[in-house]
Amino acid sequence: MKITYSNQTVDLFDKKHFPTGAPNKVVLSLSGGCDSASLAFLIATYFPQTEIHPFNCKDGDGLIDTERAISVHKYLQGRFSNIKELELFDVRTGDPVWIEKAEKEMADPRNKIMVNGKLTTLWRNVRGCSKALQCRAIRELMAKKYNTVVATGMSCNPPIEVMKERGFYDVAERKRDPGDFESLDVFDYDYGFITYTPYIFTNKKFVSGVYKEHNLIKDLFPLTKSCAWGVESGNENFPNPCGKCFWCNERAWAFQ
């Protein structure tokens, strides 16, 4: 089903990847952010026969994301019967074991890309990589439990010129930069299960369109959180957004 907002189109459960139609069930990573919340809303709205099994990675080093995910889930489940119970999994971004794994992952040449003539890692920092690795393991667990794809709300970065003009290009994850879309696919088979990222070819302007067109700005949107910085990252405004990180800047640009 093709859905268009802010002049960007997402083909949700497209025929190429879902030749028999929308799946009977889907696992969904509900992060507490506005992207995954909007994806859950769209699936629940347009595919009421598809069961949505949400989960959240409960970070012991930053619980506010899970608090937001619980609030988002309560709102969505109150509106849609196909939203099932939220499953929580404990992770810790600062876990020494996972930090060591993250350092090795970031040092691996296969996880580096060329940006402005310099090799850089796919992740912005080691803590971000640590959480990504732990969440990957949980996605695999959920995929096997429900024998279906795991949907995420990951979108691509704003245009390069926008990020540079607004001063947040250097804090963005390079793996999400817009560019050669021919090398991307909404299905990722790399880790023995399928991660489904229908927003991968669109940026957060599409997401803002979902909230605006469905009148979610005053109820669902305030329940979400995008800021990734806690006290450990120097956010003096915590638990309020720092106003400096990539996520704060991206959200401000998309919803202006």
Predicted region positions:
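Nucleotide-activated chemistry modules centered on ATP-dependent adenylation/adenylyltransferase
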Residues: 1-256
